[in-house]
Amino acid sequence: MDLKSRAETFLTTIVNRRETASIEHYLHPDAQFKHNDLPSMSTAELLAFWPQVLDESPDFRVQILATIAEGLRVWVYSRVEGRLGKGVMDDVHMLEFDGNGLLIRSRGIQREVVEEMEK
């Protein structure tokens, strides 16, 4: 299974395509999601919370720049823009999958940068 593609699809689907419901089949029912500025969330909490983020972030988009996979872990480095009204940010997501390719743990870290995203 190509976990790099799964990780990239997960991120671009929930951000650029804005399709929260269509990621559910990628998620383990007991998954945990942690983002540097938010409390930990379960799968159900993420699926309920994410549409609110999208509603408050009409210009939110992600540009994946590099993806590295090792075993069941995938690291994705991206540039994001427009999340909750913020500017351009470096974004690193560390994603861990189970043996069936379901996302079981996600940790996202972001920091603001001065540069603009490539158009």
Swiss-Prot record:
Highest taxon in the source lineage: Eukaryota
Keyword Isomerase in annotation: yes
EC number of the protein: 5.-.-.-
UniProt enzyme class: isomerase
Protein's GO biological process: ochratoxin A biosynthetic process
Residue ranges of coiled coil: none
Pfam families registered for this protein in UniProt: SnoaL_2
Pathway linked to the protein: Mycotoxin biosynthesis
One Gene Ontology MF term: isomerase activity
InterPro entries referenced in this protein's UniProt entry, alphabetically: NTF2-like_dom_sf (IPR032710), SnoaL-like (IPR037401)
Keywords on record: Isomerase
Annotated function: Probable cyclase; part of the gene cluster that mediates the biosynthesis of ochratoxin A (OTA), a mycotoxin composed of a chlorinated type I polyketide dihydroisocoumarin moiety linked to L-phenylalanine, and demonstrated to have nephrotoxic, immunotoxic, genotoxic, neurotoxic, and teratogenic properties. OtaY is probably involved in the polyketide cyclization.
Family per record: Belongs to the aurE cyclase family.
Protein's name in the database: Probable cyclase otaY
Organism: Aspergillus niger (strain ATCC MYA-4892 / CBS 513.88 / FGSC A1513)
